[in-house]
């Protein structure tokens, strides 16, 4: 069963996410039906038709070739529900309301093919609670498949099973998403906001809290927390504006409502500045104003003290810029010891995230690799948070974090778990090793997935501390120049294709 061939997909819900997922499946040459409610006037599939037209105007472009929009088949639940039987995978992407989703599941269930997989693209609702909208037979073929926005460009897809999901369904979906759709798949537990948003949004909340504590401006913080840290250029507040401040507030509220026993609960209060912006309809980029506002050609930044927009230009101090260029261990030590408020702020946000992932690893993920890859692929960090901790010196950093917790400087009093300080992780100097990545539940280093689809990937996204194949030397080199290397994969049966790797800056071809 594990080689189910997904030949046709239905996407239910022609909103922003549903339509873009459909577009990306078309990019991958997978036939797609895009369903929505029957329109009250005009053509019955008018809602889906309009969504397909809107896709052509979206930026960044959801299609590789704009004219491919014609290949999405618009559909509505009145006329086309029988066509669901033709689909091997159904992805539900309607609004985040449990009752609406359950109503839809009841309506479409009789029309789902016996072999088909049904997956929800929810970002915050419990997959287990959602599964209660299905018969036992369909529950076994149901899971969460969480794409990140915009789905053509974001590498991450989280796969979330329930206690009743058949394991082979997950293998089939992971294989399809990896090989056909070109995604990086991380399997998550059914906990609020799964892995990437749980840790990534905590990181944003920590930045907001520490920026306020140290009296830093939003544009100053963005200069400190973007490319200088090897993270997305849009850094923190610009990212929030792009995502939409209402969406941000919704994700934070999910944590507040569903994590009553979390030791970091006080932080899951929507920050006053964010709540104020949402209340005034300043939702970020889509409404023209958020933390930033474009006035003509000038981008202004919110001054939270006055509530007005002022000229931007806040930057990292020269001293802090110099510290950030130092090697990882020295960098953290200097930030921690400096009196400069920007340096203190940076040490604090590193500490807060290390504290959080240490406390929560066991409850949110199977192992440390899943957290690092989720944050790299879902939030655009060059290195995951556990990698950052490990490369800076695992034991020393752990001591510093615990010292700050004991001194009341951290965002929670929760101590770091025992596995951080003693046993295999302390002995190996971190969570990522040649054997695999640390799983607190099984108390072992868990190796990478052995799914057959990964045999094709000689260089899987490497993590600090692992020992994988080195792309610079792997295989049998045929010839090499300053700008490129031609080589063969010398594994049996793989040695019939010459591979050329570019070594030049931006992969340019020299004359």
Functional labels for PLM-detected ranges:
Residues 2-511:
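N-terminal glycine-rich phosphate-binding loop for ADP-containing cofactors
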């Amino acid at each position: 069963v594990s080689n189910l061939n997904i030949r046709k997909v239905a996407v239910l819900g022609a909103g922003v996410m549903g339509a873009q997922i459909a577009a990306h499946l078309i990019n991958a040459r997978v036939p797609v039906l895009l369903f929505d409610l029957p329109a009250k006037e005009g053509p019955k599939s008018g809602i889906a038709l309009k969504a397909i037209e809107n896709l052509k105007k979206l930026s960044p472009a959801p299609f590789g070739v704009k004219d491919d929009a014609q290949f999405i088949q618009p559909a509505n639940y009145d006329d086309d529900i029988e066509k669901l039987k033709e689909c091997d995978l159904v992805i539900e992407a309607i609004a985040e309301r449990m009752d609406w989703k359950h109503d839809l599941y009841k309506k479409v269930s009789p029309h789902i093919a016996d072999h088909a997989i049904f997956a929800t693209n929810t970002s915050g609702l419990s997959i287990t609670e959602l599964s209660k909208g299905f018969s036992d037979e369909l529950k076994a073929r149901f899971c969460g498949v969480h794409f990140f926005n915009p789905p053509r460009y974001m590498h991450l897809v989280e796969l979330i099973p329930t206690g009743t999901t058949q394991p082979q369904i997950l293998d089939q979906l992971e294989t399809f998403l990896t090989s056909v759709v070109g995604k990086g798949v991380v399997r998550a537990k059914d906990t609020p906001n799964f892995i990437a948003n749980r840790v990534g949004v905590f990181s944003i909340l920590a930045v907001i809290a520490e920026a306020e504590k140290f009296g830093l401006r939003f544009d100053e913080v963005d200069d400190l927390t973007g490319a200088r840290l090897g993270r997305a250029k849009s850094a923190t507040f610009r990212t929030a504006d792009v995502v939409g401040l209402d969406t941000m507030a919704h994700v934070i509220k999910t944590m507040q409502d569903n994590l009553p026993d979390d030791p970091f609960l006080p932080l899951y209060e929507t920050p006053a500045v964010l709540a104020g912006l949402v209340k005034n309809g300043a939702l970020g980029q889509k409404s023209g104003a958020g933390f930033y506002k474009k006035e003509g050609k000038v981008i202004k930044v919110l001054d939270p003290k006055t509530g007005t927009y002022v000229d931007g230009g806040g930057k990292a101090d020269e001293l802090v810029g110099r510290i950030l260029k130092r090697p990882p261990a020295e960098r953290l030590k200097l930030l921690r010891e400096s009196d400069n408020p920007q340096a203190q702020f940076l040490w604090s946000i590193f500490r807060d995230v290390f504290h959080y992932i240490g406390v929560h690893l066991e409850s949110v993920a199977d192992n440390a690799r899943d957290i690092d890859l989720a944050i790299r692929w879902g939030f655009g960090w060059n290195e995951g948070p556990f990698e950052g901790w490990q490369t800076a010196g695992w034991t020393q950093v752990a001591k510093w974090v615990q010292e700050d917790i004991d001194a009341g400087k951290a965002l929670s009093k929760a101590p770091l778990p025992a596995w951080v300080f003693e046993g295999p992780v302390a002995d190996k100097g971190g969570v990522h090793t040649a054997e695999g990545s640390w799983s607190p539940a099984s108390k072992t280093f868990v190796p990478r997935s052995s799914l057959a689809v990964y045999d094709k990937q000689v260089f899987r996204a490497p993590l600090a501390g692992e020992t994988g194949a080195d792309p610079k030397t792997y295989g049998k080199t045929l010839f090499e120049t300053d700008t490129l290397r031609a080589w063969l994969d010398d594994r049996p049966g793989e040695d019939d294709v010459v591979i050329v790797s570019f070594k030049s800056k931006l992969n340019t071809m020299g004359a």
